[in-house]
Amino acid sequence: PYDQAMEHGIPVMEHRIPLKVHSYQQDMMTVLEIADEFDIDVTLDHALGASDFVEELASNPHVKGVIYGPIYIGLFPGEGCKVDFDAMKMLDDAGVNTAMMTDALLSGSQMLVNQVGECVRAGMDPIRALRMLTVNPAKMLGLEDRIGMLRPGMDADIVVFDAMPCVVPKA
């Protein structure tokens, strides 16, 4: 029988978009097993505790990205996870497409740059860290030909800072 609610899964099953999976440390290996079993692409969203699974995330062809955060809010009951800023550098170094998220309604979108700054403080190159806010998310969505870079013909919203915002928070 026809079920309209199932239509949302068609682009995922046809590999046109990844399935966005809310996941923490305790869920990540299960997400990878499901992605492999059903041959679907995924992004792991939130991903606190990802430093425990760098090799697995980097080697799985179904992982289209890891979107980390937010880091400045409390966890829900039962979701005791480690906040591992170094995970983003480790994943980036391993070739995983990484991005940063805030859950803006809970933590505020202004925290995005501060969170990227924490990655820089943990050793990530500032330019690579800024890519987590620009081209990397565009690649996860398959939109890198339209957004994510300042280049002729691309769509962009531009913010000008007087210093590197992930290095100088008051920029």
Question: Can you describe what each PLM-predicted range is?
Answer:
Residues K64, G69-Y72, G78-A163, P169-K170:
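His/Asp/Glu-enriched, well-ordered alpha-helical/loop segment
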Residues Y2-D84, A99, K139-L141, D162, ...:
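Active-site core of metal-dependent hydrolases
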